[in-house]
Amino acid sequence: MPRSLKKGPFIDLHLLKKVEKAMEAGDKKPIKTWSRRSMIIPNMIGLTIAVHNGRQHVPVFVTDEMIGHKLGEFSPTRTYRGHAADKKAKKR
């Protein structure tokens, strides 16, 4: 169930401070964060945010279509390597 509109979007304060600091300085370096639960807000457009996926930080360039989504949606935590192949079928 989505978050109530009267509450507004959730964003961690430490991430919000980093975003505001980068916007006023015009800094284009990636902002490292572990906060996958934070929502993307219009202030983040044009920034690169490195979102942690459990092993490494995945760089995510924020565009206007991403507003309202969570940062964790753009940093997959699992790698899919495909199903096991049938060795008998390959020989034929």
Curated annotation (Swiss-Prot):
One term under GO cellular component: cytoplasm
Keywords (A to Z) from UniProt: Ribonucleoprotein, Ribosomal protein, RNA-binding, rRNA-binding
One Pfam family hit: Ribosomal_S19
Species: Shewanella baltica (strain OS155 / ATCC BAA-1091)
Annotated protein name in UniProt: Small ribosomal subunit protein uS19
GO molecular function: rRNA binding; structural constituent of ribosome
Purpose of the protein: Protein S19 forms a complex with S13 that binds strongly to the 16S ribosomal RNA.
Family: Belongs to the universal ribosomal protein uS19 family.
Entry's Gene Ontology BP terms: ribosomal small subunit assembly; translation
Name of the gene: rpsS
